[in-house]
């Protein structure tokens, strides 16, 4: 049984990160922007796990750091959605273009 080469993991991570970056920079819906940021974080996690497993000195450091990053990403998503709900109640929109002032 052959294993998957490291270049396949890194290529997938680059593709995922580029899709997330493109979505975060071009989309105007705040929920979609948050999802794209999560996609970029998951691409970074894939790199951590790939280098941890397939690097010159395989160890668990990358996998542990990936779990820590997933916990931070979950907290970021919860705070982001809470802010989004508060903004929606105040402005009745979730578009990034219309959220330009701090106090309205």
Curated annotation (Swiss-Prot):
NAD listed as a keyword? yes
| Pfam hit, one | Oxidored_q2
List the catalysed reactions: a quinone + NADH + 5 H(+)(in) = a quinol + NAD(+) + 4 H(+)(out)
Residue ranges crossing the lipid bilayer per the database entry: 4-24, 31-51, 67-87
Which domain of life does the UniProt lineage start with? Answer: Bacteria
Subunit composition? Answer: NDH-1 is composed of 14 different subunits. Subunits NuoA, H, J, K, L, M, N constitute the membrane sector of the complex.
Q: What job does this protein perform?
A: NDH-1 shuttles electrons from NADH, via FMN and iron-sulfur (Fe-S) centers, to quinones in the respiratory chain. The immediate electron acceptor for the enzyme in this species is believed to be a menaquinone. Couples the redox reaction to proton translocation (for every two electrons transferred, four hydrogen ions are translocated across the cytoplasmic membrane), and thus conserves the redox energy in a proton gradient.
Protein's UniProt name: NADH-quinone oxidoreductase subunit K
């Amino acid at each position: 049984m052959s294993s998957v080469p490291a270049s396949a993991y890194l290529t997938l991570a680059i593709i995922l990160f580029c899709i997330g970056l493109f979505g975060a920079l071009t989309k105007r819906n705040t929920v979609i922007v948050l999802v794209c940021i999560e996609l970029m974080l998951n691409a970074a996690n894939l790199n951590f796990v790939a280098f941890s497993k397939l690097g010159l000195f395989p160890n668990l450091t990358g996998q542990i750091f990936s779990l820590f990053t997933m916990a931070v990403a979950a907290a970021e998503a919860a705070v982001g959605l809470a802010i989004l709900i508060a903004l929606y109640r105040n402005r009745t929109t979730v578009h990034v273009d219309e959220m330009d002032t701090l106090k309205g």
